[in-house]
Amino acid sequence: MNRLVLSSATQKFIKKISDKRLKDKIKSGLDKIRDDYTVGSRKTGDLKGFWSLDIFYNKTNYEICYEVIEDDGEVIIVVMIGTRENFYKELKRFL
């Protein structure tokens, strides 16, 4: 099984979620990524090397952006989670 590492921004985002069902959907998405990181889509252009997984909840699209570092056991670093609106602009600023 792959090792999942959450960035501090990701940890803060998850901690701030008060809706239990949304938190469960995001945790389920993280479990899917841990089991098989190819479940997301590979990014191109400025974000080459990153992957993202869409989570739909209550008519809102959330993105989980992550990077895979191949080591002895693959390590998946979740860089950022947020709503789709302005997500990639904020991600590029974060990086």
Segments the model singles out, each with a brief description of its role:
Residues 1-29:
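Arg/Lys-rich, positively charged N-terminal/basic patches that mediate binding to nucleic acids
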Residues 12, 32, 86:
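Active-site micro-motifs of SAM-dependent methyltransferase domains
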Residues 8-12, 48-51, 76:
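Positions in alpha-helical segments
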Residues 3, 57-95:
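Enriched for short, Lys/Arg-rich terminal
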Residues 31-58:
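A short, surface-exposed loop/turn module that caps and links secondary-structure elements
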